[in-house]
């Protein structure tokens, strides 16, 4: 038996952070299913025992000891003969003597009831959402094992973990590390197969980069490659799965599902590449699928059953309601209308039409009585001052309080509806519309919100919310000018540049890291750019207090955004 007649598998799993028993059960169930198909080696994602990222759970010494126990127990339960590689954290035995971090980010080879080998991650990402140097020591020791096949033949397998494969000097113009673990492996060992355990978060456009990089690695090193990626959402991070296997020519011969668990059988004797067709018709479709997974997993893993959303009749709350209904079912979504004297009639009818299209429940609470109560309570103190944004924000805070009351009373998760454009410049109210336990579209620019809603109406994708209806988002919600409706005849463009201009400036500032001078040079008006840059800086205190936002771009206002609040920067 040789590589071409051996059978491999990828268990693309959705772990729950910290659920060692549940995660081991998922692995065991997957391996038991694969055992019936003659599999010799199963590869799972990075840190599959505890889920990625475990963050400061790794500082809990008992949690780490429990991981060791869980791996031993799992090894004893696995079917005999099948080799399984799982991701785990393991102790650094030299930490006390020589210093350094107490743990390694590791991969454990389990077979015949035992933990046969432990391999350690060499490259520890500490940028954007990654903070592995906080917990882990740089890996040392062998990254190779011999897979003994039933006919007496052996295969030499090299084991890498996520970032280890992201530093090829022949692929990247600029590298983050001096070392290339894959190059060192292939130079020092005669390998038959390379595997990579990964927990690579989703971002728009990232899959093309992954495929190109992994294809390059397979071709350059003349090695078949198995890449096992985590799927599921953990807090702000969404993992898209899309595990792959490449032959030594760089052709993809197995491809995992996106945004769903999957078990892939990998046979290197089965000919050429699998079709390269995408399972999503556009970026809008892909982002929607990512957000649906993000909401579903956040709700379920936080042990909620239902959600509540404020329905304004605007496009942001419409999209969030659609995402929620698709994620957890229409019967588990409550939309609350809270009209004020400034709410237009079409906003109310649009919100109700949306709810009808989605099939979600609604409840209406006019806020005029509460507005009057606040006005009376503050009348003496505010007597010599004219109305301004204070009164506008009070309306938002009344609505936020009502939604939180409903959340508390019924145990529903409140999902806030602010988009990235608004969150960037602070066009949102702290303790008002920012209230919530999850910000579903906080990384989605306003222009993208429009395009996703337009896609929802025209797509033929088999979505639950499309059953029996061609129109998901009422057309008037998409076509009417955006407005917060906090004062008479108010439009967003009274306070902000047009969204196509604003989003381009924000893209250059946040994603391309350009200065105001460079953005102005690209063709935008100086006054507009300088105002937007200032708004982004002074809104930092709001973002610091916002609900966790699902990340779908390469630069989000979440765990990877670390800007000071009290600062003075002129550049």
Where are these regions (language model features)?
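ATP/NTP-dependent adenylation/nucleotidyl-transfer catalytic domains that generate, transfer
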Residues: 18, 153-155, 222-223, 248, ...
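Enzyme catalytic cores with a strong preference for nitrogen-chemistry domains
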Residues: 1-310, 323-330, 337, 362
